[in-house]
Design a protein with these regions (language model features):
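Sec-dependent signal peptide hydrophobic core
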Residues: 9-16
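C-terminal motif of bacterial Sec signal peptides marking the signal peptidase cleavage site
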Residues: 20-23
Length: 318
């Protein structure tokens, strides 16, 4: 079996019900603070540049007022499920793999992908996931994929379609008013949106050999306002972990750096999931309103999403 784990980016959302919502009148408190845990699915199938094999993570929601410990995290991943993937004509089983079972070298690689710092001896939860490690069913644009999950006496299903991709026409760095134009530039793009289909987009940014970073807000777009038009779109650079905030260079790209833009096309169900999740994360606070994260999964929470990615690598220059 050829393991492709180093190519995988496993994004883990702990759907712990972390919404302690307040309003001007009175705080919102759930009727039942000890609701039964619900299963959460987070899975993806990809096509295009650097496509990972189909994979998913199974977790459970946590009680509203629960305390989170290393034991809680380790016990939050669901192991032993039967997961099948189908494209309508072929069906395969996804293999289960847990972090604790990996050889030391692969643990280091997996930790990097998962965002854990091994050298600092930080706690790393025993993440278990299910994947098509042999690429027996690689994602293809235009195809629909169904998953079926059997676990804890429950049957969970979901369906997603990898869209026909719409590529960027061009990327261009331009001066930005008020900034040091010799050192930092703004990135703008041009997109010809087809009128015959509804399209949903997202972008991520990688600087040099670093990881892809998703902007904390505004990374998602649909074509409701520019369907069938030629459209110019600015792509601000998101700040990296630990990067200090500087208002004069916020969103700008340092001249001379190699930059990769990951342009993602997705179906509506994945767009709705990410859009409501992103809105919820960015609107927490004492005067925020409750946002229900949308799901396309039947029998559980979460998402099963199909996407197509195109990478554009350019050097920042005028």
């Amino acid at each position: 079996m050829m393991m492709r784990l180093p190519l995988m980016r496993v994004y883990i959302f702990l759907f712990s019900t972390l919404f302690l919502i307040s309003s001007c009148e009175e705080p919102f408190i759930p009727e039942n603070l000890q609701q039964e845990p619900q299963i959460v699915v987070e899975g993806f199938i990809e096509a295009g540049d650097g496509a990972n094999p189909a994979y998913l993570v199974l977790t459970k929601t946590l009680p509203f007022l629960s305390s989170i410990s290393s034991e809680t995290l380790n016990n939050n991943y669901i192991s032993g499920a039967k997961v099948t993937l189908s494209d309508g004509s072929k069906t395969i089983n996804l293999s289960e793999l847990c972090f604790k079972d990996l050889p030391p070298a692969l643990k280091v690689e997996a930790a990097k992908i998962l965002g854990f710092n091994v050298s600092a001896n930080n706690f790393i939860p025993n993440v278990c996931f299910y994947a098509d490690l042999n690429f027996a069913m690689p994602g293809q644009a235009g195809k629909t994929y169904q998953i079926e999950i059997l676990t804890e006496g429950k049957k969970i299903t979901a369906s997603t379609t990898i869209p026909i991709p719409v590529s960027l026409d061009s990327l261009k760095f331009i001066p930005n008013a008020g900034a040091n134009q010799d050192s930092f530039l703004l990135l703008t793009s041009k997109l010809s949106d087809p009128i015959a289909q509804q399209n949903f987009y997202r972008y991520q940014v990688k600087m040099g050999d670093g990881p892809f970073i998703t902007p904390g807000g505004g990374s998602l777009f649909d074509d409701r306002l520019f369907n069938g038009q030629n459209f110019r779109l600015n792509l601000p650079r998101p700040g990296g972990d630990g990067e200090s905030f500087n208002i004069s260079t916020f969103g700008l790209y340092p001249v001379g750096k190699e930059t990769t833009i990951r342009w993602v096309n997705m179906d509506q169900s994945l767009f709705d999931f990410w859009n409501t999740l992103e809105f919820s994360i960015n609107n927490q606070g004492p005067f925020s309103t409750y946002t229900r994260v949308k799901t396309n999964v039947k029998g559980a929470l979460g998402v099963w999403g199909g996407l197509y990615a195109k990478n554009y690598t350019i050097t920042v220059k005028k």
